[in-house]
Amino acid sequence: MLIIWEKKDIFQSTKQIFKLEYEKHMHNYVISVKNSYKRREHITQEFSKHHILFDFFDAITLETIERACNELSISLENSQLSDGEKACFLSHLCLWKKCIDKKLDYIAVFEDDVYLGKDANSFFMDHNWLTNNQFDFIKTETFLQERKLAFSSIDLPNNRKIRELKEPHLGTAGYIISQKAAISLLNYVKSFPEEKLLPIDHMMFEQYLYYKSSSPIYQMIPAIVAQEFILYPNQNNMPSSIEESRLLRKQNKQKRPLLDKIAGELSNLFRKTLGKLLRTRVTFY
């Protein structure tokens, strides 16, 4: 494959780097703050290495939160989310709306600190494998944790499988949704009272997971997307811009009643002992 490198702007999307017709391929969007030059350089190099076309989606920022809320007809004024969490939340919702408005069959969404696994272009350059299996919602990312998955699996190319996710697996750095799933997710999130809204990964991969009208969420095994802080915890070249908000949320979390705390500890004990037999470690490859 011929690669054309534009020296004047290494951060442009790879649809200008590769001589291919983008419309015939998966629509890949990387959420990134416009002036995050280091992260954008990393993504350009990572996706170019795998010969994958993508577009940067300029992330919502503190300055554009109000405008994004108006465009989405949603209010976050009384939510408990920090400004950073609001911006992240809205960035994902804007992409779902883009998928719906442009009538795209599928979109793949990434955050800008990810690494891609082996043969990634087999999954992010063509969506026939999704259409053929009628998948609507796939988590391509992992936190390298053990998760409860459906026993049955569906084989994918290059020694990967798909299994339905049966318990929360947080993170929004890598997922694929169909237009049908985008509509379902957007309607679900917008139906929530704003004071009950949680960070977007909790809404998608925890709350929505148990929603009776949700599209099934499938986990790719091994996962093909992982963030830098997961794969290289000591490297920290791209620190999270909302990690402070998450830590503050944990510190300010309301203390649970004693009985709830005991029940939680027993649940954790089961998960770490007998529960391990029911779970699968979601590896990265």
Spans of features found by a protein language model:
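Intrinsically disordered, low-complexity regions of eukaryotic proteins
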Residues: 8-11, 203
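Short, positively charged and aromatic/hydrophobic N-terminal segments
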Residues: 3, 10, 17-22
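An acidic/histidine-cluster motif and surrounding catalytic segment
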Residues: 18, 22-110, 114-285
